[in-house]
Regions:
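Membrane-embedded transmembrane alpha-helical bundles that form the catalytic cores
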Residues: 1-394
Length: 394
């Protein structure tokens, strides 16, 4: 089920909002002095979130519940076992990465081993929807508890709510636990929240249905197939259409998630900030999928040493992982390394002289490299990718 489905818009969402508003009344009337002032609302949201997820993944909903239960136990262990809290964190991280690796990357790694002459059975495992997002949120929870930036969640249902919340479960943004921990147990919904949230949701829906879907048709018209007859003009039209499609699609889903969250009393962080207006690739990645960027910055880049030591290596690791996170395919790895190289070069060259370069030149420079990056991102077949770039540059 996706937000643009008619069933979601005219059946699921109205029914959920009705039940949620009734549960809000129950919380106010039945639990005015409780320490958990959102118990009924949380239970309602969890039930509908599991239905939402099970609609497309009836079996994998149990995988998500098991994953949450493991993190629930590990989180409590980190907080209670002072002497072994680091060991508990490591166990939790390994469990999360094993689940993600098994379902997302096992087939890819098996194919790589087969390509170098080893005989390895290639598992046929379908990818659970949203597993990359909810795995990273689970990791965020464990690390925030370990760093004492948040307390462990003592109610399993509330942790399940954090991980499975349907507004951001499928396509983000990645919600940091320390930013919503208080709202899980105590949040208030005002008329202003509902109005602003609804407006944001419909803006996102318009981006997806009116703009992204149309640009998708244009991109597919030029970039699908064997590409043997693709002209330079066709290549540019196709990749520019895809550049616009992926922005309106992804930012549209983020707008809908943020808007729905606002209607429910949650304040999710922004995920996009006019990224195509950037004057460098470094700036672009501060404005594109901001929740993923902040995750890698705070949980990978800075712990590795950040700007203090081995900066180039740290950047490479982050961008290699960024590429892997987007998909189990070589083109995504190349795409990540491509941007990692550019960001590294910018730190040592462009960013030191950027104020002397005309803005229009910087914008054109950034857009060109972004478009080339989306070309790498689009094609999983290297033959098609080669034909595309040969056509793109004549």
């Amino acid at each position: 089920m996706v937000f643009s489905d008619l069933f979601f818009l005219f059946v699921f969402l109205p029914l959920f909002m009705l039940c949620y508003m009734l549960s809000n009344v129950c919380d106010k009337q039945l639990r005015p002095n409780s320490t958990n002032k959102t118990a009924v609302r949380n239970a309602t949201l969890v039930v509908f979130s599991l239905i939402f997820y099970a609609w497309g993944e009836p079996m994998y909903v149990f995988l998500m519940i098991i994953s949450v239960f493991i993190n629930y136990l590990v989180g409590i262990g980190i907080e209670r076992q002072e002497k072994h809290r680091k060991f508990a964190l490591i166990i939790g991280l390994i469990c999360n990465l094993l689940i993600l690796g098994t379902f997302k990357y096992a087939g890819f790694f098996a194919e790589v081993l087969c390509s170098v002459g080893l005989t390895v059975p290639i598992p046929k495992i379908s990818l659970p929807i949203g597993i990359s997002f909810y795995t990273f949120q689970s990791i965020s929870y464990l690390i925030d508890v370990y760093r004492r930036q948040a307390s462990s969640q003592r109610r399993f249902v509330d942790l399940l709510l954090y991980v499975s919340m349907f507004p951001q479960l499928i396509a983000g943004p990645i919600v940091r636990y320390d930013l919503v921990a208080k709202e899980i147990n105590d949040r208030h919904i005002t008329r202003h929240d509902v109005v602003e949230g609804s407006y944001r949701f419909f803006i996102g829906l318009g981006k997806k249905v009116i703009l992204a879907n149309q640009f998708s048709e244009i991109a597919n018209q030029f970039l699908q197939g064997e590409l043997s007859g693709l002209t330079m003009q066709g290549a540019w039209v196709g990749i520019i259409a895809f550049t616009l499609q992926i922005f309106f699609d992804f930012s549209g889903y983020s707008d809908m998630a943020i808007g729905l969250g606002r209607c429910l009393g949650f304040h999710f962080a922004e995920n996009f900030d006019h990224p195509y207006c950037s004057r460098s690739i470094t700036e672009f990645w501060r404005k594109w999928h901001m929740s993923l960027g902040s995750f890698f910055r705070d949980y990978v880049y800075i712990p590795l040493g950040g700007n203090r030591r081995h900066q180039a290596l740290n950047i490479f690791v982050v961008w290699f992982l960024t590429g892997m996170w987007h998909g189990a395919s070589w083109n995504f790895i190349i795409w990540g390394v491509y941007f990692g190289i550019i960001v590294t070069l910018e730190k040592y060259t462009l960013l030191k002289v950027i104020r002397y370069i005309p803005r229009v030149v910087l914008h054109l420079y950034s857009l060109l490299l972004i478009i080339i990056g989306w070309g790498i991102f689009y094609f999983t077949d290297f033959t098609h990718m080669q034909r595309f770039f040969l056509s793109l540059f004549g």
